Amino acid sequence: TDSEGNSYTVQVPYNYYILNVKLTSKPISSVASELLTPEQLEMYQVYRQTLGNKPLIFGGGSPDMSNSEDLTGVVFVNGTRPGNQAVVDIAKSQVGNVGGQPFWSWYGFNSRVEWCACFVSWCYGQMGLSEPRFASCQSQGIPWFQSHGQWGGRDYANIAPGDAIFFDWDLDGRADHVGLVVGTDGSRVYTVEGNSGDACKIKSYSLTYECIKGYGLMNW
């Protein structure tokens, strides 16, 4: 608009530029392995166990807030594998522990992580075993048992005290939780689990429970 109130149009020259950008996509697992320290990478592998918008933000563990179960009156059925009652007794002695200390610090973490696998590894460590030792169910625990020929699927019928039991809560094919087998009465499997609602508890499940992913079979 000019001084007399008349509108007019003016063409103003300008320069413009086109920016061509090439983007490279990398999976987060690749970035993690490149940028994280060994301790951070191990923690990341633990966190990967639970994915998506779930009650457990990070993986490993059970959201079960129910009380520990009573084994009074349970009649266990012995299979052909001997198992190890001593490691079961060690695990049972920790029932009532809340928060997972000393299990995650024994493993080497400086702060709390989801600690079900640390608990199982700690129990084996108290027996003088250096292996199996794992903080992640899916990426460390199961591969160890499979690579040593010590893996049994959900329908494996000869579990023994001291075996590891792995769970897949959301049935996505990845193990989310692990505990120690106390024994079976022929229809149910009884366990001691760390990080079950952030506590050590005795639990039991039908042997056909669909969330049982399989068993790590210990050779004593």
Regions found by a protein language model. Name each.
Residues 1, 97, 166-168:
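Generic short beta-strand segments
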Residues 2-9, 147-150:
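Surface-exposed intrinsically disordered loops and tails
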Residues 5-78:
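Non-catalytic propeptide/linker segments at domain boundaries
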Residues 8-10, 177, 200:
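Short beta-strand segments
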Residues 54-129:
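N-terminal capping segments
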Residues 130-198:
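...with weaker cross-activation on analogous glycine-rich loops/strands in unrelated enzymes
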Residues 187-220:
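Active-site signature of cysteine proteases
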